[in-house]
Amino acid sequence: MFTGSIVAIVTPMDEKGNVCRASLKKLIDYHVASGTSAIVSVGTTGESATLNHDEHADVVMMTLELADGRIPVIAGTGANATAEAISLTQRFNDSGIVGCLTVTPYYNRPSQEGLYQHFKAIAEHTDLPQILYNVPSRTGCDLLPETVGRLAKVKNIIGIKEATGNLTRVNQIKELVSDDFVLLSGDDASALDFMQLGGHGVISVTANVAARDMAQMCKLAAEGHFAEARVINQRLMPLHNKLFVEPNPIPVKWACKELGLVATDTLRLPMTPITDSGRETVRAALKHAGLL
């Protein structure tokens, strides 16, 4: 369940900015039918930054309910205060989620020792499997391989989403962790190369709109059929890149609407609607991928 194509799912909203249950069900059904390995609910792409904690928990629980055991659900539970992250994580004890994706603290930029103590404290307050999430371009701090190696010794820290796009990290981390520690890419554009170096899969934005292709690409890569996987990846490459032509999740939410997967592309401020130029750029990438 922690391998292959795991979607960082968008949080669909109605025109008033309320979570749209019907669209969420449609998305989940789409991922079940497409072979997506698991769903990350309320991560960065799911607009965790603009949901309060009650809404955050409600969306995760709604996702679990609608998934109905058909696909594993992982909850995004990070915060930049350790006590807050512990509290949010503990909301999902015994809920049915299979694990938590926990981002490094953002804005306050802790030291490596601070990062170690932060993640260790969270893990010690829950039995839920913990996946570390390193995305320094967003958080302002970088979880270094040596710290990952230390954290991998904590019993329920089972993997990392490594979203630097720096492929040297794969081998650096592999040298410091056990073979069963899960290495997931957080960068669609380099995910196939990441897997070829020994990674286990990707937590994907692209999978929101190209779920079947991403699942197939990861399956081929896991089986060692990298030439075939690369054919799919080359077709998706403009999409990997152009889904970030404007801040995530603006482009991917619009793309979901364009493909009829959600009813609206409504976002909450400070996220704003996609621009005309962004729309045309993403539409061209969808066509290149064979999705339009």
UniProtKB/Swiss-Prot annotation:
Pfam families noted in UniProt: DHDPS (PF00701)
Keyword hit for Amino-acid biosynthesis: yes
GO molecular function: 4-hydroxy-tetrahydrodipicolinate synthase activity
Annotated site (Part of a proton relay during catalysis): T44, Y107
Leader sequence residues: none
Listed SMART domains: DHDPS
EC number: 4.3.3.7
Keyword line: Amino-acid biosynthesis, Cytoplasm, Diaminopimelate biosynthesis, Lyase, Lysine biosynthesis, Schiff base
Subunit organization: Homotetramer; dimer of dimers.
Purpose: Catalyzes the condensation of (S)-aspartate-beta-semialdehyde [(S)-ASA] and pyruvate to 4-hydroxy-tetrahydrodipicolinate (HTPA).
Protein's name in the database: 4-hydroxy-tetrahydrodipicolinate synthase
